[in-house]
Amino acid sequence: MIPVFDPVALGLYMLGYLFMFVIAATVAPRVAGAVSGRLTLYGAMALTGVMIVLTTAFVIYLFVLVAAPTLATVSFLVGLIAFVVLMNLLTYVASPYIINASYGARPDPRLQQIVDEVAARLGAPFKLKAVVVDGPPNAFAYGNFLTGRYVAVTSGMLSLVDRRELEAVIGHEIGHHLHRDNAIMLLFGVLPSVVYYLGVTAVHMGLGSGNSRGGNAALLAVGVVAVLASFLIQLLVLAFSRLREYYADTAGAKAAGKEAMQFALAKIHKFYFMAPEARQAVSESKFRALFIYALVNAVANPFVTITRAEVEQIKRANYSALQEVFSTHPPIPKRLRFLDQLPL
């Protein structure tokens, strides 16, 4: 039985995090650079998704192979997967209620009208609930089959962008709903946890006395591999999330034009550059993965304006490749350059 304080699990977690940091700092940027431009957005999403699924399946196969496919092993595996899925499903169901309460979400008739217009433009086959929340410039999509689909826009965003730019931002969020990103990322987000707990369990089984020496060594090896693989899968899930943001940007561009999407993103980038305390607030939010801008530092500045020259300058701005690898969102400069390539 695993104790409440588990030094083995703690050691494995530290090892996995070190492994993830090394991969993120060395291998990931090179792979991303080599692949960039050679695959379409759809190709990159397909490849990343396949890598996530295959890596997870391979680790599960190794565990079953070494632990022997007995009824107890299969039962444990099914139970573990069911438990992790159930916990994530409960979070998925409860999160809209938590978000509404945490952010003080409130309906807004004018915003609802704009959301309805943009939704019709994008051919959305479902009803969307538009809400305003307090906070610095941001927007996010959330909801589920019980609560319905929400598009939230902060008061700071409403003060920052013009009508056309707001339509682009809303189009981006509706894109997340159209692409079913909440459900897809929930599914993929489960996999690193399953593989990690599988690895920790295998190590504990290997350290037990009930197996032969060779069997113990094999279980230990599979356990360590599984833990390391779970952190690798987490990096792949983050990469997949960044690709889904590009995908949502295409919806924003379709809704209001590439220029409106670029100007909205550039204004957001400029705002957070001018307000580092707001960047920190967003980066510490538990819901940052939902935001349109999440590489971020709480006061909205309604006087932020942007010119085409500034947009071009932001496109060439430097950004941290390491920070990008650990983020759910691509850097704004890369998103602006991506929008340039869209055939719209």
From Swiss-Prot:
Keywords, in A-Z order: Cell membrane, Hydrolase, Membrane, Metal-binding, Metalloprotease, Protease, Transmembrane, Transmembrane helix, Zinc
A Pfam family: Peptidase_M48
Major location (coarse): membrane
Matching Gene3D superfamilies: Metalloproteases ('zincins'), catalytic domain
Cofactor: Zn(2+)
Listed transmembrane segments: 8-28, 46-66, 74-94, 183-203, 220-240
GO cellular component: plasma membrane
GO molecular function annotation: metalloendopeptidase activity; zinc ion binding
Positions of the catalytic residues: E173
E.C. code: 3.4.24.-
Topological category with respect to the lipid bilayer: Multi-pass membrane protein
Name under which the protein is recorded: Protease HtpX homolog
Taxonomic source organism: Pyrobaculum calidifontis (strain DSM 21063 / JCM 11548 / VA1)
Gene behind the chain: htpX
